Amino acid sequence: MFLNVCMCVCVCVRIVLFHSSLNMAVASSSSISARSILFKSTFFEAPRFFMKSVSNPSKLSLNFFLFLPRIPSTDATGMSSNSLNILINPISRLFNLFGTWDFFKSARNSSCVLPFSDTCLFRSSDISLSTLFTVAELLYFFNGVRFKSFLSMIAAEVISSSVSVGAAGVTLGSCGVTFFLFNVMGEEDSSMGVGVKSDLVSSTVSSLLSSSPSPSSSLLSPPILGFFTSVTLVRSRFLPSSILLMNSLLLMRWLAPNSNSSSGSVS
């Protein structure tokens, strides 16, 4: 409880510091990365964090782990950013480790970590996934932004894809779409323009939300949506193939308890 309270305080402080530094960065630079980070933090990460905290207070430290953005250590010209990043980035990575360890403990001590409808997405037997999340954050902690899009964000988005938002239990997004919103909007070396990317994000999210997945509908479950979305994005060269592999593993883990329960009911 004390750790959760400390995380709440740090979130409030970090929001103020983060947005103040980003406002200065956006005012002094027109780089794509600065605008995309401000967009992701204002319109995507903060609402998702607070919605999850209200709907599932027991996972506050996990929500904190999913919320924290990273400030790039260099600006568009390759020069070092202001000294505020020297303080914020290590704190961000440290609390990410706390959030990962919280999920690891819940996976070890609980029979069902993330329930969805009448099934369970992550059980206590999924220690291998929890270990992967912990190792990913450790690698990020010691190596910095080089492992961001390959390991650290995979761990965060695989978890966040299966967290229910709202009292009705309707889930928003999937692994592929969430990862796309986090990373592709900030890529500057892509051959496509930012406007095309923004249109693709809007159309993908609107198509997912228009389907309104119900808790009893297994065909519209987040792992299945994430799998097919990641297939599309990988074929369009928006995502690395490692994301498709992670979504495939999550899809197999999702289908395994359903197949076992169906076979048990038939017998």
From Swiss-Prot:
It is a multi-pass membrane protein. It is found in: Membrane. Keywords: Membrane, Signal, Transmembrane, Transmembrane helix. Residues 1-27 form the signal peptide. The chain crosses the membrane at residues 125-145, 165-185. One of its GO terms (cellular component) is membrane. Partially overlaps IES1. This is Putative uncharacterized protein YFL013W-A. It comes from Saccharomyces cerevisiae (strain ATCC 204508 / S288c).
